[in-house]
């Protein structure tokens, strides 16, 4: 009997402590979110009434501009809209490329960059970057009749990469580790790289596999083999760290 009373007392006490802990935790989270919402970086956008977001316009499924509908579409476009909705402001999509996205953050043209931006230590040293919202790996798009079926088949061949992207550095690191040699052609956009592949100016077009999927056709294939995990993050200038912290709460 005494044991049952003690057990009942301990159960009630445990539940009471757990309830207090949960209430305290929810209160802390709410206070943190309120603090971020009222931060200078976030309130600047709220008062303006518009969130300026840099997005890609040539990456199907992520950031793509449709001339037919005159709209932007893709998961990154949707993510930008979600953040704007949370802030109760309009969203203004600003097209970026791998070459222009960082300068547009530097000069304040865009508040956030949501454009297949790979997280790495060098970028984290220069920009405020969110937690990852997407994971991928680097891949290769080749012509089906090229005879190229694995990465080692590209030894001594020419690979097309995007200017300003981290792909070339990753390929150089991979080649060095696997005793391979690649030649490189750097172009300004993904459509240009796809055209170069069809024109046989490059033997492969290399970037993250999810991006390559938007350029696959009856004549091309993405190699099953890939390498180096890529993490995409939302980025902004260092002065907008509170804005990035706010987006982390939404991811």
Please identify what each model-predicted range represents.
Residues 31-36, 77-86, 148, 152, ...:
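Extended ligand-binding regions for polar small-molecule ligands
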Residues 42, 74-76, 124-133, 221-225, ...:
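A structural signal for short loop-to-beta-strand junctions that line the ligand-binding cleft
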Residues 135-142, 209-251:
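Periplasmic-binding protein-like
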Residues 31-115:
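Extracytoplasmic small-molecule ligand-binding "clamshell" domains
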Residues 2-28:
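Sec-dependent N-terminal signal peptides of Gram-positive bacterial secreted proteins and lipoproteins
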Residues 65-69, 80-89, 167-186, 217:
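Ligand-binding cleft/hinge of the Venus flytrap
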């Amino acid at each position: 009997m005494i044991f049952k009373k003690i057990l009942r007392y301990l159960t009630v006490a445990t539940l009471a402590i757990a309830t207090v802990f949960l209430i305290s935790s929810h209160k802390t989270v709410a206070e943190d979110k309120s603090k971020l919402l009222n931060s200078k970086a976030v309130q600047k956008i709220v008062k303006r009434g518009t969130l300026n977001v840099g997005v890609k316009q040539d990456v199907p499924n992520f950031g793509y501009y449709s001339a037919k509908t005159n709209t932007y579409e893709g998961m990154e476009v949707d993510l930008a809209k979600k953040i704007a909705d949370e802030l109760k402001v309009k969203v203004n999509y600003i097209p970026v490329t791998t070459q222009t996205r960082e300068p547009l953050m530097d000069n304040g043209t865009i508040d956030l960059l949501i454009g297949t931006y790979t997280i790495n230590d060098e970028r984290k040293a220069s920009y405020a970057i969110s937690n990852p919202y997407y994971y991928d790996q680097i891949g290769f798009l080749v012509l089906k009749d090229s005879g190229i079926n694995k990465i080692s088949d590209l030894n001594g061949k020419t690979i097309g990469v995007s200017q300003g992207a981290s792909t070339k550095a990753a390929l150089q690191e991979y080649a060095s580790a696997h005793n391979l040699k690649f030649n490189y052609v750097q172009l300004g956009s993904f459509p240009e790289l796809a055209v170069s592949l069809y024109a046989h100016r490059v033997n492969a077009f290399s970037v993250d596999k999810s991006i390559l999927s938007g350029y696959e056709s009856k004549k091309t294939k993405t190699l099953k083999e890939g390498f180096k995990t890529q993490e995409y993050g939302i980025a902004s200038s260092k002065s907008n760290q509170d804005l990035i912290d706010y987006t982390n709460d939404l991811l």
